[in-house]
């Protein structure tokens, strides 16, 4: 067990994670006394705490996370908010089932804070960081699914290249994939630093804005956790769970996530989905969301200085409308 994991067990409320775009998230969620809210990605708990304080004395939060360490943190925090914070171990791909199992429907607001928490990134045993030596794992839930090492050591060069290009937008995808396949023929690739060194070798001595392994690690993490599929499922279910007037807020950290969220919001806010040029609407589509953020909200320079992790964050928000358009 890593030192960080041991400390987390001794003090579940200890965290290095600072919630991103907290003020904007609260503004768009607009928590109120007696409201019911879902934090679909509890993480360090910063957003949930703020929602609980803003919805005092009787607002409730269903705190969902796939990471058992985050759920332990939520259970510890729940003792400070008896009857108001409901910890839940699960993936937001099952959002509707989880909410219904708690009788937590309909709801007044749902927050998705996507990507990694600082605690996950800082724990070498989790295998998310290319700067810290650890096993090639990358699972949000270490008790479920296969680690990244399985992909790295069993997928073909063609499959790896497609993965790095599709989920990492990595321009050197094919060269990196070939290098991985050649290296694993000599010895298994089992650690984060081992993989990062291989990728850096392909990049050579060129100086880049980001570490050469950034995109490869992103692609592997997305694949291991099926993040985009989970996000698409979670967003679709979130709309169903919201009462009219309820708010949906999503914070994304890379272009693939943000693009998916933007397209989903636009589709759900559109009055018609017929192909351009169709003389009369025949699709029967009725909008279910009203956009609150025509453009994504970005962190201020001050927040980026204080919390560099927030640099790539993009927040989008929408409001559930009734079928009659109100």
From Swiss-Prot:
A cellular component term, taken from the record's GO annotations: cytoplasm
Location, primary (coarse class): cytoplasm
Gene Ontology molecular function terms on file: rRNA (cytosine-N4-)-methyltransferase activity
Keyword list, A-Z: Cytoplasm, Methyltransferase, rRNA processing, S-adenosyl-L-methionine, Transferase
Localization per record: Cytoplasm
Pfam families to which the protein is assigned, alphabetical: Methyltransf_5
Top-level taxon in the UniProt lineage: Bacteria
Biological processes, Gene Ontology terms: rRNA base methylation
Residues annotated for S-adenosyl-L-methionine binding in this entry: 45-47, 65, 113, 120
Composition skew (Basic and acidic residues), residue ranges: 316-326
Region (Disordered): 299-326
Catalytic activity from the UniProt record: cytidine(1402) in 16S rRNA + S-adenosyl-L-methionine = N(4)-methylcytidine(1402) in 16S rRNA + S-adenosyl-L-homocysteine + H(+)
SUPFAM superfamilies on file: Putative methyltransferase TM0872, insert domain (SSF81799), S-adenosyl-L-methionine-dependent methyltransferases (SSF53335)
EC number, as in UniProt: 2.1.1.199
Family: Belongs to the methyltransferase superfamily. RsmH family.
Biological function: Specifically methylates the N4 position of cytidine in position 1402 (C1402) of 16S rRNA.
HAMAP family linked to this entry: 16SrRNA_methyltr_H
Protein name per the record: Ribosomal RNA small subunit methyltransferase H
Organism: Thermomicrobium roseum (strain ATCC 27502 / DSM 5159 / P-2)
Phylogenetic lineage: Bacteria, Pseudomonadati, Thermomicrobiota, Thermomicrobia, Thermomicrobiales
């Amino acid at each position: 067990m890593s030192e960080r994991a041991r400390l987390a067990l001794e003090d579940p409320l200890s965290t290095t994670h600072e919630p991103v775009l907290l003020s904007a998230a609260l503004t768009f969620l607009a928590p109120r006394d007696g409201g019911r809210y879902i934090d679909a990605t509890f993480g360090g708990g910063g957003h949930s705490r703020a929602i609980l304080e803003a919805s005092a004395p009787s607002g409730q939060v269903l705190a969902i996370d796939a990471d058992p360490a985050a759920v332990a943190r939520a259970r510890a925090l729940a003792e400070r908010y008896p009857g108001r914070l409901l910890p839940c171990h699960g993936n937001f791909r099952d959002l509707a089932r989880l909410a219904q199992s708690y009788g937590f429907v309909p709801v007044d607001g749902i927050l998705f804070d996507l990507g990694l928490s600082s605690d996950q990134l800082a724990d070498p045993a989790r295998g998310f960081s290319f700067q810290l030596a650890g096993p090639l794992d990358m699972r949000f839930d270490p008790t479920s699914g296969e680690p990244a090492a399985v992909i790295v050591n069993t997928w073909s060069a063609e499959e790896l290249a497609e993965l790095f290009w599709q989920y990492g937008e990595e321009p050197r995808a094919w060269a990196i994939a070939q290098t991985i396949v050649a290296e694993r023929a000599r010895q298994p690739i089992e650690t984060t630093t081992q993989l990062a060194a291989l990728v850096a070798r392909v990049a050579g001595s060129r100086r880049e804005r980001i570490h050469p392994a950034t995109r490869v690690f992103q692609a592997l993490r997305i694949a291991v956790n099926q993040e985009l599929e989970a996000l698409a499922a979670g967003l679709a279910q979130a709309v169903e769970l919201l009462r009219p007037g309820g708010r949906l807020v999503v914070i994304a950290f890379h272009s693939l996530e943000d693009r998916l969220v933007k397209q989903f919001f636009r589709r759900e806010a559109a009055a018609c989905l017929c192909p351009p040029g169709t003389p009369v609407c025949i699709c029967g589509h009725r909008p279910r969301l009203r956009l609150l953020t025509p453009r994504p909200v970005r962190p201020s320079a001050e927040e980026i200085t204080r919390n560099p992790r927030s640099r790539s964050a993009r927040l989008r928000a929408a409001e559930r409308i009734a079928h009659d358009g109100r």
